[in-house]
């Protein structure tokens, strides 16, 4: 396991670094996947978006796929869409992540994917609209 600020801080740090095995160990040890870190963010909000496996582990252990950043109203699906990580976006969506919620600027995840030129992500989001 990681060492540092305790299990909750370690989980956020491991998720942010995409450390699948450390995330697995911490979750199996009972660390709360929804606990806020010292910056007021949850592991699923700070996770390495390119690691769909980290997302899947957090979600399997009860992470909330719809937690919103209090300042920007972005959710993990917004982040995955903006960065173009289709596998992570699909994992979030399958776990109940809402694709129809706007951020503080009125943008949907599909808008962010299109702005960044992530055609495969935008195509998925358009195809699943209305789920």
Swiss-Prot record:
Pfam families: Ank_2 (PF12796). GO terms for molecular function: cyclin-dependent protein serine/threonine kinase inhibitor activity; protein kinase binding. Keywords: ANK repeat, Cell cycle, Repeat, Tumor suppressor. InterPro entries: Ank_Repeat/CDKN_Inhibitor, Ankyrin_rpt, Ankyrin_rpt-contain_sf. Belongs to the CDKN2 cyclin-dependent kinase inhibitor family. Heterodimer of CDKN2B with CDK4 or CDK6. Interacts strongly with CDK4 and CDK6. Potent inhibitor. Potential effector of TGF-beta induced cell cycle arrest. This is Cyclin-dependent kinase 4 inhibitor B.
